[in-house]
Design a protein with these regions (language model features):
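Hydrophobic/aromatic beta-strand elements that line small-molecule binding cavities or substrate pockets
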Residues: 7-9, 35, 62-69, 80, ...
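Intrinsic-disorder/low-complexity, polar/charged segments enriched in Ser/Thr/Lys/Arg/Asp/Glu/Gln
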Residues: 2-8, 45-47, 60-62, 75, ...
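Short, solvent-exposed secondary-structure boundary motifs
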Residues: 25-30, 55-59, 84-88
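Beta-strand/loop substructures that line and gate deep hydrophobic ligand-binding cavities in soluble
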Residues: 79-129
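Glycine-rich portal/gate segments that line the openings of hydrophobic small-molecule binding cavities
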Residues: 39-81, 137
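A conserved amphipathic terminal alpha-helix motif
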Residues: 118-148
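Hydrophobic ligand-binding cavity/cleft-lining segments
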Residues: 1-53, 148
Length: 148
């Protein structure tokens, strides 16, 4: 099942502070919803374990994440792959980090995912709604941590 998403998150923090945060694998990993563990491998790679629940499909997903920052363009791309309990997901996501003026920043993000296995069989609407919720939670966590 192929899924596509996009949106924006306004963050009341300056561009440099936001850029430093979103390119730090420890910080990014801790913003994943229902994260159980984050293990940083190097400055652009980390592993994460997240608790997943979509319909009757519940368990832990092990994810491998690669951050691909482009400092000149202020764009961060991510590749995420992994799975658990017979399901798998491959995702690409990106965010443009844009100066919104007055000490604020906007993250303009997009992503696409391919899900396979029991999690994909749950049904498009259920999976799509859950994925949208998780993405919104992740960006809300980024905003919350940078607003503190």
């Amino acid at each position: 099942m192929n899924l596509q998403y996009s949106g924006e998150q306004h963050i009341p923090a300056g561009l440099d502070r936001v850029w430093t945060f979103v390119t730090d694998p420890e910080q990014v990993g801790r913003c994943f919803p229902n994260v159980v563990d984050v293990s940083v491998q190097d400055p652009t790679h980390f592993d994460a374990v997240v608790q997943v629940g979509v319909g009757p499909v519940r368990g832990k997903f092990k994810l491998k994440v690669e951050l691909q920052p482009d400092t000149a363009k202020r764009r961060l791309d991510m590749k995420i792959s992994g799975g658990g309990f017979g399901s798998a997901v491959d995702m690409t996501a990106g965010a443009d980090v844009v100066d919104a003026g007055a000490g604020a920043t906007t993250l303009k993000w997009n992503g696409q995912a391919i899900a396979r296995g029991p999690i994909a069989a749950v049904g498009g609407r259920v999976l799509d709604a859950q994925a949208q919720k998780l993405i919104a939670e992740a960006f809300a966590t980024v905003r919350e941590r940078l607003s503190a």
